[in-house]
Curated annotation (Swiss-Prot):
Pfam families: MsyB. Coiled coil: none annotated. Disulfide bonds: none annotated. Residues 112-124 have a biased composition (Basic and acidic residues). This is Acidic protein MsyB. It comes from the Bacteria. InterPro entries: MsyB. Could participate in the normal pathway of protein export. Residues 96-124 are annotated as: Disordered. GO terms for cellular component: cytosol.
Length: 124
């Protein structure tokens, strides 16, 4: 799992990875049908992004499906509004780091560490 500090960096990296995984296709001929994204909040409050592109709609990856068809192709082609993508993101799907390298939608409340993390998240 590789995370990036900006959504733009994550999209660029995912585009490069898609092309590397499909060696016979160049960027102009790529046919992308699905755009997946995942937002992370680290313990220090930094926000990180992970993005994936897929040639077939419905493919599963590490991230959540966000756009499909022409919308996914537009993002792949660089024709997108980062603010719009951020606004479309559903905050309840954001993963929070509660222990180093361990991410969850919510901290576990059955441990003192989890309760402390929940209190910190509530303060933000």
């Amino acid at each position: 799992m590789t995370m990036y500090a900006t959504l733009e960096e994550a999209i660029d990296a995912a585009r490069e990875e898609f092309l590397a995984d499909n060696p016979g296709i160049d960027a102009e001929d790529a046919n992308v049908q699905q755009f997946n994204a995942q937002k992370y909040v680290l313990q220090d409050g930094d926000i990180m992004w992970q993005v994936e592109f897929f040639a077939d709609e419905g493919e599963e990856g590490e991230c959540l499906p966000m756009l499909s068809g022409e919308a996914a192709q537009s993002v792949f082609d660089g024709d997108y509004d980062e603010i719009e993508i951020r606004q479309e993101w559903q905050e309840e799907n954001t993963l929070h780091e509660w222990d180093e390298g361990e991410f969850q939608l919510e901290p576990p409340l059955d441990t003192e560490e989890g309760r402390a993390a929940a209190d910190e998240w509530d303060e933000r």
